[in-house]
Regions:
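Bacterial N-terminal signal peptides that target proteins for export
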Residues: 12-32
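C-terminal motif of bacterial Sec signal peptides marking the signal peptidase cleavage site
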Residues: 42-43
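N-terminal capping segments
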Residues: 46-115
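Aromatic- and glycine-rich peptidoglycan recognition patches
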Residues: 49-56, 132, 154-211
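Short alpha-helix capping/helix-loop boundary micro-motifs
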Residues: 125-134
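Short, well-ordered loop/turn sites that connect or cap secondary structure elements
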Residues: 137-138
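Structural motif
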Residues: 141-143
Length: 211
């Protein structure tokens, strides 16, 4: 399948087990090639302080790949969990920013790029790890910064799919009691949509990467 030899001796045992589980979850949705690339995931470490990195906006192909992983999370019955950043496996729990981080981490496998930080809140990504863009420039996999209608504070983040007939479609991880009966009608990673003028949208952006 691949002529290039891959060195995985440095991969920790626990990390290797994660990729075995990832393969069985995604085996009907991803190619074997992406699974093999996943073995390189742990090689993407946090940047060293003595090395100078170059920052760029995430290329479109990286953003689209991140969205594809968001789709897989949505199809894997992922539950919402504040602070969660579980890799894709059984009994997955993840919060809104954790979803974005993990999708981009998977999307960056076998590339020269890494995230600016390995753990970020929605507000941190808005202020420090993204380039703000007009709504008209949104592409699949870009970031939707969101919050309460009555506040300007970014407290939530989603990944953009498309805008069609004035409606913005996206994937996010959240808990919501829509009917007001005390039961969460939404609990986890789902596909959702809002009007493009909804006040819960605070800004739109591209993920910043470095290499």
């Amino acid at each position: 399948f691949m002529k290039k030899k891959m060195k995985i001796k440095g991969l920790k045992q626990n990390s290797f087990k994660k990729y075995i589980m990832l393969y069985f979850i995604f085996k009907n949705k991803l190619t074997l090639g992406l699974f093999v690339f996943g073995l390189l995931f742990m090689s993407c470490q946090n940047p060293q302080n003595n090395y100078k990195y170059t920052e760029i906006d995430a290329p479109e192909e990286i953003a689209e790949r991140a969205y594809r992983f968001a789709e897989l999370y949505a199809e894997s019955e992922t539950e919402y969990d504040l602070g969660g950043q579980d890799p894709a496996r059984t009994a997955i729990k993840i919060d809104c920013s954790g979803l974005i981080i993990m999708c981009y981490k998977y999307a960056l496998v076998d590339t020269k790029y890494i995230l600016l930080q390995s753990d970020m809140t929605a507000n941190y990504m808005y202020k420090n790890a993204s380039t703000i863009i007009p709504r008209a420039d949104l592409k699949k996999g870009n970031l939707l910064f969101m919050g309460e209608e009555t506040s300007d504070t970014v407290s939530h983040i989603a990944i953009f799919e498309k805008e069609e007939n004035g409606i913005i479609y996206f994937i996010d991880s959240t808990q919501k009691d829509i009917n007001g009966d005390g039961i969460n009608d939404i609990n986890g990673v789902t596909r959702r949509k809002y009007n493009n003028n909804d006040k819960r949208f605070k800004a739109f952006g591209k993920m910043r990467l470095m290499y």
